[in-house]
Curated annotation (Swiss-Prot):
Lineage summary: Eukaryota, Metazoa, Spiralia, Lophotrochozoa, Mollusca
Signal peptide: 1-21
Domain-level remarks: The cysteine framework is VIII (C-C-C-C-C-C-C-C-C-C).
Keyword Signal found: yes
Known function: Modestly and reversibly inhibits Cav2.3/CACNA1E (IC(50)=5.8 uM) recombinantly expressed in HEK293 cells without affecting the voltage dependence of activation. In mouse DRG sensory neurons, modulates depolarization-induced calcium influx.
Subcellular localization(s) per the UniProt record: Secreted
Name of the molecule in the record: Macroconotoxin Mu8.1
Length: 115
């Protein structure tokens, strides 16, 4: 089994076993986070990066879109994912990036200047 298939299988298991609509922390922009499936994107990204695979942002965007539908790839969702990913690859802690994205990113294009 190649690494790509293994990753896809692992992500599917993680996403299917995750309680859909998991509670989000108080103060988060929960409607957009739920709609964009940012929680699931986060889990996928962490799994992908732990396996040191390439192109994790693109891989996880594709996986989430396939599982939850094309609405998860709308413009506002792309902004959430981009801000979270930028923070994480800058070496910030995962918890810091999650809290920051969840509490301050609204999905507006202006968010990209500050995330």
């Amino acid at each position: 089994m190649d690494m790509k298939m293994t990753f896809s299988g692992l992500v599917l298991v993680v996403l299917v076993t995750t309680v859909v609509g998991s509670s989000v922390r108080r103060g988060e922009n929960s409607d957009n986070l739920t709609h964009c499936r940012l929680f699931e994107f986060r889990l996928c990204l962490l799994e992908c990066m732990s396996l040191t695979l390439d192109h994790c942002y693109a891989r996880c965007t594709t996986v989430i879109t396939q599982i939850h539908g094309s609405d998860t790839n709308r413009f506002d969702c792309t902004i959430f994912k981009t801000c979270y990913y930028r923070c994480y690859v800058l070496g910030k802690t995962e918890d810091h990036c999650w809290k920051g994205t969840a509490t301050s990113v609204t999905g507006d294009v202006g968010d990209l200047e500050f995330c």
